[in-house]
Swiss-Prot record:
PANTHER family: GLYCOSYL HYDROLASE, LP05116P. It is an enzyme of class 3 (hydrolase). This is Beta-glucosidase 1B. Substrate binds at Q25, H128, N174, Y316, W430, E437, W438. PROSITE patterns: GLYCOSYL_HYDROL_F1_1, GLYCOSYL_HYDROL_F1_2. Plays an important role in cellulose degradation. Shows hydrolytic activity against several glycosidic compounds. Residues 481-524 are annotated as: Disordered. It catalyses: Hydrolysis of terminal, non-reducing beta-D-glucosyl residues with release of beta-D-glucose. Induction: Expressed in cellobiose culture, but repressed in glucose culture.
Length: 540
């Protein structure tokens, strides 16, 4: 059903909604069942790298509690779940000639089967920042284009081969801007490289982020090439990339600030979106960086352009933009939340970079659709309530500021689709669970479900209840065959403030192992052809 065919004030019947997570933020079990280290394992244990000094060794223990998390998704009534695969759980040493870890394959295969059995569509991210440590040690990871592209494409091919019979929605990368700028520019994310010698013993913030971004684009594009040439014809499905970027509003009506807002969008979004969808880097980035911005060969550009079936949009806030900034990572634009009259743009979140401003969400949807002309999936969007981590449980569950945020965003989403004609096909709230929030440790909470990190009990917040009611009320119904209706999972009513602890849903927690047919889907397959094929189409 198209958006235009849906009833008034309804999203189309095939609209996907759900929640998102990332492997390192929730799984824990970092040294279990053959998993290799990622760059975040040791980095998060370096004193001062996380606000609370904690790491991801346990996180929300979802490697062991994934059935409980699936129960929670069913209780919320979601149609889809976006999660990421840990590269070093699949290929512990990461490389194209390194062995595949069958225990890692089985873990994700079982999760995918369980989701499908409960009527939930898996929406899978291949890379959410957890590069195998071995690849960083061998050749500095994303800084070595020739090596990393081959290794990433082989990893992607393994996932397509082993899971592609069941996964029909793929994301190659999560937020390349963060990979590049926060990991190799500011040095606050793994691997923590920066020109600031107080922060990092090595790195060059003036060159490395742009090299890394270039490598990420090429790895994405060649993985998509592999998918389209080797898998799409037989298995169908969609593949794309998810890019972060917040709406940029001019601070006032002055020409220089209007131009500054566009420059902010060029660097935050256009850096990656323009080559992928339009076939070239933004002119402003070329002007700003000169020869520090790598160039694509004609052969590479032919692979890069058009290498995403849709636009994966991660967004959280809106920035007011002034000309005259000195931060290249922001396009030499100054960001502020303070209007000319001294008022704030919106309610402040716990993190300083986020305020609630729903109109900007609608503006960004319109901008992306008009500029890139691709269907949009909102792959991440959420809010961190101020000081939520220090609140008593009952108070934390009444997350009014997060509810207000989602009320505004969902209203803007509906208006963008129904009034503006934007083709939005899905929405994923961030996040299903409170979790390891990277450099913030566990202090900043984005979940619609409260996690007691001492007991690992899960407690739905009011925001989760709101979304679980809003989307069913605003998605058009589609008739289903009687047989299919019988198979569909019926979500239990979601009660606010109810604890979901390990084993509380005994029927599901005691779920037997997947049937032999399901196990066969995760069985070992030949991979030698991937290496030969990858080398051939990369010209290496």
């Amino acid at each position: 059903m198209s958006a235009s065919a849906a009833p008034p004030n309804k999203l189309p019947a095939d609209f996907l909604w759900g929640f998102a997570t990332a492997s390192f933020q929730i799984e824990g079990a970092t040294d279990v069942d053959g998993r290799g280290k990622s760059i975040w394992d040791d980095f998060s244990k370096i004193p001062g790298k996380t606000l609370d000094g904690k790491n991801g060794d346990v996180a929300t223990d979802s490697y062991n509690r994934w059935r409980e998390d699936v129960d929670l998704l069913v209780q919320y009534g979601v149609k889809s779940y976006r999660f990421s695969i840990s590269w070093s759980r699949i290929i512990p040493l990461g490389g194209r000639n390194d062995p595949v870890n069958e225990a890692g394959i089985k873990f994700y295969s079982d999760l995918i089967d369980a989701l499908l059995e409960r009527g939930i569509v898996p929406f899978v991210t291949l890379y959410h920042w957890d590069l195998p440590q071995a690849l960083h040690d061998r050749y500095l990871g994303w800084l070595n284009k020739d090596e990393i592209v081959q290794d990433y494409v082989r990893y992607a091919g393994v996932c397509f081969e082993r899971f592609g019979d069941r996964v029909k929605h793929w994301l190659t990368m999560n937020e390349p801007w963060c990979i590049s700028i926060l990991g190799y520019g500011r040095g606050v994310f793994a691997p923590g490289r920066s020109s600031d010698r107080m922060r990092s013993p090595e790195g060059d913030s003036s060159t490395e982020p742009w090299i890394v971004g270039h490598s990420v684009i090429l790895a994405h594009a060649y993985a998509v090439k592999l998918y389209r040439e080797q898998f799409k014809a037989n298995r169908g499905g969609q593949i794309g990339i998810t890019l972060n970027g917040d709406w940029a509003m001019p601070y006032d009506d002055s020409p220089q600030n209007i131009e500054a807002a566009q420059h902010a969008l060029d660097v935050a979004i256009g850096w990656f979106a323009d080559p992928i969808y339009l076939g070239q880097y933004p002119a402003y980035m070329k002007e700003m960086l000169g020869d520090r911005l790598p160039e694509f060969t004609p052969e590479e550009l032919a692979v890069v352009k058009g290498s995403s079936d849709f636009y994966g949009m991660n967004t959280y806030t809106t920035n007011l933009c002034k000309a005259g900034g000195e931060d290249e990572f922001q396009g030499n634009v100054e960001y502020t939340f303070t209007r000319p009259d001294g008022t704030q743009l919106g309610t402040a979140a716990h993190c300083s970079w986020l305020q609630d401003y729903a109109p900007g969400f609608r503006d960004l949807l319109n901008y992306l659709y008009k500029r890139y002309r691709k269907p949009i999936y909102v792959t991440e969007n959420g809010f961190a309530v101020k000081d939520e981590n220090s609140k008593p449980l009952e108070e934390a569950l009444k997350d009014d500021d997060r509810v207000h945020y989602y009320q505004g965003v969902t209203d803007s989403l509906l208006a963008a689709v129904k009034e503006d004609g934007v083709d939005v096909r899905g929405y994923f709230g961030w996040s299903l669970l409170d979790n390891f929030e990277w450099a913030d440790g566990y202090i900043t909470r984005f979940g619609v479900t409260y996690v007691d990190y001492d007991t690992q009990k899960r407690y739905p917040k009011d925001s989760g209840k709101f979304l679980s009611q809003w989307f069913p009320a605003h998605i058009a119904e589609s008739p289903k065959p009687a047989a299919e209706t019988k198979k569909a999972a019926t979500p239990s009513p979601l009660k606010p403030h109810g604890a979901i602890s390990n084993g509380v849903s005994k029927k599901s927690s005691a779920t037997k192992e997947p049937k032999s047919a399901s196990r066969k889907k995760g069985r070992k397959a030949p991979f030698a052809r991937f290496t030969a094929y990858i080398s051939a189409f990369l010209g290496l």
